[in-house]
Amino acid sequence: MSVDLSAQQVTRMKKLQKKIRSEVGKAISDYNMVEEGDRIMCCLSGGKDSYAMLDILLDLQQRAPIKFEIVAVNLDQKQPGFPEHVLPAYLDSLGVAYHILEKDTYSIVRDKIPEGQKTCSLCSRLRRGTLYGFAQKIGATKIALGHHRDDIIETLFLNMFFAGKQKAMPPKLLSDDGANMVIRPLAYAREKDIAEYAELKGFPIIPCNLCGSQENLKRASVKEMLNQWDVEHPGRIESIFTAMQNTSPSQGVDREQFDFISLTRDANAPLKGEVAESDLPAFDFVDVSNNGHIDLDAASKAKRVNPEHKINIVSTYTP
């Protein structure tokens, strides 16, 4: 879609494109998302995220030192009022290979889910199954989804708050049957940057409320919490994502991730690290059978002056 932009807006658009492209490139490199000869099935929903993902991947395709194919795929789930002409017209204008799949999952969901209940879970499973199957049919080696960093962090808190799990969306995922590899190239990109970029680019956004499903109130509440943090505590969101990349199982409580049961100490281990740097040599002169109050600062200083110095007991504990 053509958008008339001021010189300032053009500059801003180019700056955002460079930023997002850099983040996508780093994510691809960090997780080995794209390899020589890959055929990437880029899943388009008609939303800002998938449009931006396709746009950036096409740009990187021209710059990358490796060769890979991009095939855009949209699943038309026959939701009432879905503008079927929008995506084909846009993709034709780009000259990119694409497929529009038609499958009436909308009717299946309406038949299975009682009126008033959320349809998202079943709808998502049906959509995923169709896309996974089609990826194998066309020989796609990777399936690219448009989830960004905010989605990943929101999912972590949703699972922590409502499912009791430390689980998010991995940037790269092997399907349960091992047949499909899912990648999320926008894993390092912020939603606010993507939204601004999509507006400046004039992507033909298709509204996401066509199914008439209820808003996911849990996700909305988590998003609101994170947005508030982002305003009140700049840098906190970045810190959370960095923490997700720097986990330490031995410092946690998950027995499945670390073998706490088999932990044993080595009584003959040499002193090193924090222990070696402390004043513990003063303990060499302590009579541990004596319940006393010991001035370690004075003891350490005295020991350095006179190695034979004995520690004076400041006070004695009497039960």
Curated annotation (Swiss-Prot):
Its main location: cytoplasm. The keyword Transferase applies. [4Fe-4S] cluster binds at residues 120, 123, 211. Its cofactor is Mg(2+); [4Fe-4S] cluster. Belongs to the TtcA family. One of its GO terms (molecular function) is sulfurtransferase activity. Keywords: 4Fe-4S, ATP-binding, Cytoplasm, Iron, Iron-sulfur, Magnesium, Metal-binding, Nucleotide-binding, RNA-binding, Transferase, tRNA processing, tRNA-binding. Catalyzes the ATP-dependent 2-thiolation of cytidine in position 32 of tRNA, to form 2-thiocytidine (s(2)C32). The sulfur atoms are provided by the cysteine/cysteine desulfurase (IscS) system. One of its GO terms (biological process) is tRNA thio-modification. A motif (PP-loop motif) lies at residues 45-50. This is tRNA-cytidine(32) 2-sulfurtransferase. It is found in: Cytoplasm. Its EC number is 2.8.1.-. InterPro entries: Rossmann-like_a/b/a_fold (IPR014729), TilS/TtcA_N (IPR011063), tRNA_Cyd_32_2_STrfase (IPR012089). CDD domains: TtcA-like. Homodimer. Pathway: tRNA modification. The keyword Nucleus does not apply. Pfam families: ATP_bind_3.
